[in-house]
Amino acid sequence: MLRVAVLVSGGGTNLQAIIDAVENGTITNTELVGVISNNKNAYALTRAGNHQIPAQCVSPKDFETREEFNKVFLEKVDELKPDLIVLAGFLVVIPEEMISRYRNKIINIHPSLIPLFCGTGYYGLKVHEAALARGVKVVGATVHFVDEGTDTGPIILQKAVEVEEGDTPEVLQRRVMEQAEWKILPHAIDLIANGKVTVKDGRVSIAR
């Protein structure tokens, strides 16, 4: 069984998609071993509790220095003994020590077709605002492994979503979630859980 820990900062809609997929068998060979948030008010913690998944908050605000936070945060992650760490809307910079320790074992969902609208400053609604301002006709989502850069790790899965006339950032965000994020994130976890994903020279191969 693949032991999966999920890190999340907000409402946890992607977390819910993962939970649902594990429970309905879309994700196989997987156990959700814990949820960690940097926000004690994150509804994601409630979602986890509703499904008897251990959940806790570790916030940078509770520590005098970022080094102290990084140390405790990494300890809490290590305690879960995860085989895979999923960033599902986690708005805290991951310590580099954690990235090196869990090389190619951390994945992130980003609400654009990387390399478009990604990197520093592109998160949440800002991605969709930028896409509409540029006038693109197709947007989407990307699941990728996490490296030391911002949204620069090897790409696992992508799914495109059409922009429709009259879209607002909020409407587009919801469509990207429903048509892309909530589908490819569970799919990526299932592929990894079943040993179908390999990384070589910065590129992902998926066994059929």
Positions of the model-derived regions?
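One-carbon transfer enzymes
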Residues: M1-R208
